[in-house]
Curated annotation (Swiss-Prot):
InterPro entries, alphabetized: EF-hand-dom_pair, EF_Hand_1_Ca_BS, EF_hand_dom, S-100_dom, S100_Ca-bd_sub
GO molecular-function terms, A-Z: calcium ion binding; chemoattractant activity; identical protein binding; transition metal ion binding
A GO CC term attached to the entry: extracellular space
Positions with a binding annotation for Ca(2+): 66, 68, 70, 72, 77
PANTHER family named among the record's database cross-references: PROTEIN S100-A15A, S100 CALCIUM-BINDING PROTEIN
UniProt keyword terms in alphabetical order: Calcium, Metal-binding, Zinc
Origin: domain of life: Eukaryota
PROSITE patterns in UniProt: EF_HAND_1, EF_HAND_2
Pfam families per record: EF-hand_1, S_100
Domain EF-hand positions: 53-88
SMART domains for the chain: EFh (SM00054), S_100 (SM01394)
GO BP annotations listed: inflammatory response
Full protein name: Protein S100-A15A
Annotated organism of origin: Mus musculus (Mouse)
Length: 108
């Protein structure tokens, strides 16, 4: 049985994390530089749409996710980052739907 699209997406997330984590130091964690590269290379549309490409945003996201304050992002902390980005993108999607609906129905 082939993987479903969601299963394939989950595998890709795991692979992406390990691909970038292997660039320097600990192969099971991301440094700030590895996280920046991962986000800007792998989810550029999310970052652009959310207005999140600024280095300070990624640095703050790193600090918020680094729960144990070891200056590394483990996989669980990475999932927190992905969750935040997906929630922000989902909210943006709903804002666009509302704006489209309001425009179509002359509510502005």
């Amino acid at each position: 049985m082939p993987d479903t699209p969601v299963e394939d997406s989950l595998f890709q997330i795991i692979h992406c994390f390990h691909h970038y984590a292997a660039r320097e130091g600990d192969k099971e964690t991301l440094s700030l530089e590895e996280l920046k590269a991962l986000l800007l290379d792998s989810v550029p549309r999310f970052m652009d749409t959310l207005g999140r490409r600024q280095p300070y945003y990624i640095t703050e996201l790193f600090r918020a996710a680094d729960k144990n304050k070891d200056n590394q992002i483990c996989f669980d902390e990475f999932l927190y980052i992905l969750g935040k980005l997906v929630k922000d993108y989902h909210l943006q999607f709903h804002r666009q739907l509302c704006a489209h609906y309001c425009t179509e129905h002359s509510l502005y």
